[in-house]
Amino acid sequence: MTHPLQATIEELWERRTELSPQSPPTTIAAINSVIGDLDSGKLRVAEKIAGEWFTHQWIKKAVLLSFRVRDNRVQEAGDIRFYDKVDTKFEGWTEEQFRQGGFRVVPGTIVRKGSYVAKNAVLMPSFVNIGAYVDESTMVDTWVTVGSCAQIGKNVHLSGGVGIGGVLEPLQANPTIIEDNCFIGARSEVVEGVVIGENSVLSMGVYIGQSTPIYDRETGEVTYGRVPPGSVVISGTLPKADGKYSLYAAIIVKKVDAQTRSKTSINELLRP
């Protein structure tokens, strides 16, 4: 079913260079409505339909257009001041709104308006960008970056210093996706629209982009852009054909088993 604002956003995109903070109020209201629905979780940039991820390009366009129709303004958090076009998600929130949200936000966390955080999530000091979606019972640990429009599933653990790539700059066709029940090890980076299949575990310091070879030790197969569900992945190298050098690769060493789960399971005591 087509969203009532989709045609409007597509039309505005075709004449995006004409847009400014002085654009007609109806134009700005249409864009802000999409951002508001992203913020509340009514819309998301990508969703799984019939087992496959589908990106709503028009919503991503609305996120980009929002930068055209807003002026920078001074924002304050106590004695700290900022100057930006995007409001913070929790500006003006009351204690009751946080209670209704049902998640924890530790001091030092920055979440931009237009991102969604579901119940029972925990946000340690981290950065969650506009358009991102953080699902239920997910832990976003210290110094994690959740990039623009990234999709993070349920019961995910993003360990300290993890980077999940965004789509706005450099411009990407599809968001980076971490599916349900994944564990992403400390200082790992997943970018450029890569999909990490559900129940997978990435070891510490694994880097995966669209050009990173993903080698399955069991089958010998090399793939790109997607880690199959239930994979345990470590950093490694693959030798080149001439044997003169090796290049970085992500290595699937095995499938997740009970031992793996015992080491990476979430701790309910830390949830709200």
UniProtKB/Swiss-Prot annotation:
Name one molecular function that GO assigns to this entry.
2,3,4,5-tetrahydropyridine-2,6-dicarboxylate N-succinyltransferase activity
Q: Which residues bind substrate?
A: 104, 141
The UniProt entry's GO CC annotations, sorted and at most eight, read:
cytoplasm
EC number(s) on record? 2.3.1.117
CDD domains recorded: LbH_THP_succinylT (cd03350)
Which InterPro entries does its entry note? DapD_Trfase_Hexpep_rpt_fam, Hexapep, Hexapep_transf_CS, THP_succinylTrfase_dom1, THP_succinylTrfase_N_sf, Trimer_LpxA-like_sf
Q: Which GO terms describe its biological process?
A: diaminopimelate biosynthetic process; lysine biosynthetic process via diaminopimelate
Q: Which reaction does it catalyse?
A: (S)-2,3,4,5-tetrahydrodipicolinate + succinyl-CoA + H2O = (S)-2-succinylamino-6-oxoheptanedioate + CoA
Q: Spell out the coiled coil positions from the record.
A: none
- Decide whether keyword Endoplasmic reticulum is in the record: no
**Which SUPFAM superfamilies does this one have?**
Trimeric LpxA-like enzymes (SSF51161)
Under the heading Gene3D superfamilies, the entry gives:
Hexapeptide repeat proteins, Tetrahydrodipicolinate-N-succinyltransferase, N-terminal domain
Its keywords, alphabetically, are: Acyltransferase, Amino-acid biosynthesis, Cytoplasm, Diaminopimelate biosynthesis, Lysine biosynthesis, Repeat, Transferase
Q: Does the keyword Transferase apply?
A: yes
Q: Where in the cell is it found?
A: Cytoplasm
Q: What metabolic or biological pathway is this protein involved in?
A: Amino-acid biosynthesis; L-lysine biosynthesis via DAP pathway; LL-2,6-diaminopimelate from (S)-tetrahydrodipicolinate (succinylase route): step 1/3
Indicate the quaternary assembly.
Homotrimer.
Q: Which family does it belong to?
A: Belongs to the transferase hexapeptide repeat family.
What is the name listed in the Swiss-Prot or TrEMBL entry for this protein? 2,3,4,5-tetrahydropyridine-2,6-dicarboxylate N-succinyltransferase
Q: Which organism is it from?
A: Dechloromonas aromatica (strain RCB)
Recorded name of the encoding gene? dapD
